């Protein structure tokens, strides 16, 4: 009888073990569509998690096509993170919808709470790395932590502890960054999320979108710089184009400060890039304030000059009328 109970107990344990999912012991396999996403993923990864990427460094992701080896890799992934705006990323999402891959696919623009800004020139949504904005970045990382904890419950505490540290670091950067209120021109839309949280409003873009030609009327941008309608030039640091160099040259000629922004496609965590932006803003904040004072002084002077010219013209007119009246009386 005891033997029968023992056999029954073993059978029950086997059945329960088959029903209840076992804790993951080998970590998650996470794939990033862009290599620039990897460093942020590694901030939160639990020991045992593996992080890899698809597009090689230096390759334009807008022109990239999935290779057979890419397909094999993503079929093994547990989680895939994409920016959700290139053709090869759309293919990955399509494969997930059709059930061709088992991975959970996260498209950054579709994460609840992510704010997508409008391209200041085209008025269309700007999908170029919205996580460069501090609030979007925290929203993104918290969402990742929850998804990774769901897929790998054994590391739930670790993921959430990492998120707490990340949030505090970002909040410190935001608190220490001088806030501005200034209109700017930038070389491309990839810098929009990196600067607008500071109060820098992009009014002009030399290149409005990837694949488009430069603004056909650069004279408009140059005129805005000369007339003081623009108080700051924003340039992508690592991947400068000839238009970036043109902007820097015009900024020097007009005495306007230049803010250099790490490309969102470059290596390094978003926190490191935000720290760099913060230091850059702090270093030029006084010159921006001086420029604003100077620009306002110039506008005031222009108003006074106009008033002076009008007064002189009226004086001449009155004098001419007096002479005319005297001449008429003498006749």
Listing of model-derived features with the role each one plays in the protein:
Residues 17-331:
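Extracytoplasmic metal-acquisition and chelation regions
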Residues 1-10, 308, 326-328:
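N-terminal Sec-pathway targeting helices
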Residues 9-17:
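Bacterial N-terminal signal peptides
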């Amino acid at each position: 009888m005891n033997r029968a109970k023992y056999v029954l107990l073993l059978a029950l344990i086997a059945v329960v073990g088959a029903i209840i999912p076992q804790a993951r012991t080998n970590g998650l396999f996470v794939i990033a569509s862009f290599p620039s996403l990897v460093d942020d993923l590694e901030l939160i990864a639990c020991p045992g998690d593996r992080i890899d990427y698809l597009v090689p460094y230096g390759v334009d992701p807008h022109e990239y096509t999935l290779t057979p080896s890419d397909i094999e890799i993503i079929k093994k992934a547990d989680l895939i993170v994409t920016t959700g705006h290139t053709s090869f990323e759309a293919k990955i999402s399509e494969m997930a919808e059709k059930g061709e891959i088992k991975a959970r696919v996260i498209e950054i623009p579709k994460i609840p709470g992510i704010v997508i800004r409008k391209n200041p020139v085209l008025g269309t949504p700007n999908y170029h790395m919205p996580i460069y904005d501090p609030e979007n970045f925290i929203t993104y990382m918290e969402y990742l932590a929850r998804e990774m904890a769901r897929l790998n419950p054994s590391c739930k505490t670790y993921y959430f502890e990492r998120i707490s540290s990340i949030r505090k670091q970002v909040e410190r950067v935001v608190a220490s960054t001088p806030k501005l209120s200034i209109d700017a021109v930038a070389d491309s839309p990839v810098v929009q999320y990196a600067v607008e949280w500071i109060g820098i409003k992009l009014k002009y873009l030399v290149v409005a979108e990837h694949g488009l030609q430069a603004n056909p009327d650069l004279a408009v941008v140059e005129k805005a710089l000369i007339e003081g309608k623009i108080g700051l030039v924003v340039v992508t640091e690592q991947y400068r184009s000839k238009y970036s160099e043109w902007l820097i040259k015009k900024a020097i000629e007009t005495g306007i400060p230049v803010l250099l922004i790490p490309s969102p496609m470059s290596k390094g965590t978003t926190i490191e890039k935000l720290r760099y932006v913060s230091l850059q803003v702090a270093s030029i904040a006084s010159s921006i304030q001086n420029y604003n004072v100077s620009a306002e002084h110039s506008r005031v002077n222009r108003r006074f000059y106009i008033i002076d010219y009008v007064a002189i013209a009226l004086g001449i007119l009155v004098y001419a009328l007096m002479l005319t009246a005297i001449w008429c009386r003498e006749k």
